[in-house]
Each structure stands twice: as structure tokens, then as C-alpha cells.
């Protein structure tokens, strides 16, 4: 596998990321709903019109942004397509726990080039080495015999083995009848170390200024939960057990998060030099979205919890100089937003985006 990675490294260092800045993905024929690569050499982006989109480094979901290489490595880029335009909304990282030690896919160095971020790549099955291209257009199936019109797009996401021996991989799915939802199923290769947990965490809640966390009997406000915190580190509190999660009509545990701000407030940006120099944190979509996690009823155990942390200032890498940080307008917001559960091979999570406000989504979910 790593010999294949090293051969590709030479390509990566001669400007390939710039190629992907200019093209997010090619749609299939106009009468279909899917966003898929045209061929194996296209940028690695998959999704559905009017719904969720997922991509891998070095592809940028938003096209040509100066200085961009599609965002950090070691992450799934999760976006939303509306009216022909895709916007990046969040990232999802992979965080395996082995013998009490947790690794972070976006900040641990690659064994290929020593740069931060594990290499992720797509495949139509569980074999093959790294490529910066799509490798596969994805597989379309009909998962519901009672509704043969429903289609499901699936693709495998493979990644470098972690330093602690963890060797997980993902199967991503999007269903045509649930366009706002991304299925993420976790597996491990046979040579993987035993994982106590393998968290999938949405890492960029500050971008959407997520401040309201909806549980069964209460709404947690990040401004109150992290009130008074004004440092550059993450603020952490205890997780919430599955017993406190919402349930949808099928009995699935669900947790939702949204901004407390109106769209006009969310889209505004301070007009001062420190903020203008960090405009990539400005919220760019022309709509608000509710974000949520879900698990299937009966498909989880009592270890399932909701975990959030917070930040009062936007992330600025590992930089310890506080002058490189700017305050999140409006106060502390949730940054990492995730479900955690004891690992088992094949466990399934769903991450969703909806144009509906959380209260409206809860009523009809």
C-alpha cells in the first residue's frame, strides 16, 4: 500500500492540488439526481442534488479559492448542494482509540510525507492504494425492495494505518429518499489493532456558529455551557448519555445542533483587519442548516453518548501565539459535535444537514 502512496507523492508535490481547486465534481446526466465523478481520474466528490455532498483532499467542494488545497487532510469534506452551487459546511474526522490512546486523523502526520493529516482515498471495494483521484464513480443500488425507485450511492473510504495500529475504513452511503443524510459505516481491516472506540466527529461547528444543542428534554446553549471561557484552547464538558437523546418516529436516537443567529447575523462579518485577513471563517452559504447525528433504533448499545466541545476563538492550527486568533462573533460555539460508542465492526452512524430549523425538523422527523 505504501509503495503506491510514495509513487503518488511525486504527483502531489507538482501542483495537483491546484488542479482540484477549479473543479468540484461532474454531475451525471441531467435527468438524474446524483453528483458523481465522470471517471476514475476525476476529482473525488460524490453527492446528490438538493442535498449532501462529500469529498476528499485535494478536491475543493467550493471550487477555486486562492491558497486552498481543498482544506486540511485526514478529513471528509461535507457540503450541501442547492440550486447548482456546493458549499462546504463541515469536516468529519476519524479518531480511533487503542489502549486508551486516541489518534486524530487530521493532525497526525502521514507516514508518506510527514505532513499533518492522514491520507484518505476512495475505492469501490476494500482494496487498493492511495490516489488523489476519485478511483471510483461509486456504486448505485436499490436497497429497499418495497420501494424499487429508491437508489443508494455508496463508496468506500480507505486511509493510512494509524501509529497505534488502528486500521479502520468507512463505507459511505447516500439514499435518494434521504438526500440530506450521509451514512457512515465503520469497519476494520484484519491487521488492525483492537479499537475500543472509533469516533467520527464533525469538527467545524464554529464555522456555522452552532450554539444550540437539542436533546430530549432541553436545549443546551454553548454560551451558557462555556460562559466566561475566553482562551484559545478547546473547552470540554461531560458528554450526554443516549437516554437524553431525541427519538424520531422510528425510535432512532437523534441529536441536533443549529446556530442561534438569524441568517443575516450569521452571514455578517466584522470589518476589521484581523477578520478580513481570516475571511475563510466567514459563513458563505446563502441559507442556514440544521446539523444532526442519528443511529438506527436497535443498532446501538448503552455506551452511546453525545459529545461536544467548544471554542471561543476560531481554530488557528497548533499556533500558541494568541494574536493569531480571533473571537467567534457572538460568543463560544460548539466545535466538535459527535456520537461516541464502544466500537464494533460494521457500526453505523448518520450525519445529516437540513434546511429546516431544528424545532421544525424535530416535529416531522
Language-model features, listed with the residues they occupy:
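Bacterial N-terminal signal peptides
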Residues: 10-18
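Acidic (Asp/Glu-rich), glycine- and aromatic
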Residues: 171, 177-238
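Low-complexity, serine/threonine/proline-enriched polar segments
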Residues: 105-117, 122, 225-271
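N-terminal secretory signal peptides that target proteins for export/translocation
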Residues: 1-5
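Extended, loop-rich substrate-binding clefts of extracytoplasmic carbohydrate-active enzymes
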Residues: 112-180, 185-191, 195
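Sec/Tat signal peptide C-region and signal peptidase I cleavage site
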Residues: 21-25
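Beta-strand-rich N-terminal accessory domains
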Residues: 26-118
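Beta-strand-rich recognition/accessory modules
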Residues: 27-52, 57-60, 244-365
